[in-house]
Amino acid sequence: MSIEVGQKAPIFTLPTDEGEMLSLDDLKGKKVILYFYPKDDTPGCTKEACGFRDVWSQLSKAGVVVLGISKDSVKAHQSFKQKYNLPFTLLSDKDNTVCEQYGVMVDKNRFGKKYKGIERTTFLIDEEGVISAVWPKVKVDGHVAEVVGRL
């Protein structure tokens, strides 16, 4: 299932990097940048997270919420967040339920080994909970600027 512009964003509840539960439904009335990434503390994922960190003051002043989602554990998210001073929330989707809902789980092949993994994807969700932009197969360079430009 892939999510397209104009669709209602699938509602989910996941544990945050602080171990609390967060529901997308709780963020109605705010713009949300929801970005899915493969793994904490890897080169591309770190660069993407630090990109959002570096424009955080601009985003927070505009009332925009940034949420990062991966399969990493709450503990891994805590370490990643602390190591890179990330000011936004990271969510743990250990069983890939939300990744599947949003259609970001894809077949991958690394060194001949086939597996299911997260395809780096960003969704912009408007104040009504509707998808207003989608960036599939994200290339990290220039991505954050492109997202900010759509706000």
Curated annotation (Swiss-Prot):
GO cellular component: cytoplasm
Disulfide bonds: 45-50
Stored CDD domains: PRX_BCP (cd03017)
Documented EC number(s): 1.11.1.24
Catalytic function, reaction form: a hydroperoxide + [thioredoxin]-dithiol = an alcohol + [thioredoxin]-disulfide + H2O
Top-rank lineage group of the source organism: Bacteria
Record: active site: 45
GO-annotated biological processes: cell redox homeostasis; cellular response to oxidative stress
Family as reported in the entry's similarity comment: Belongs to the peroxiredoxin family. BCP/PrxQ subfamily.
Name of the protein: Putative peroxiredoxin bcp
Source species of the chain: Coxiella burnetii (strain RSA 493 / Nine Mile phase I)
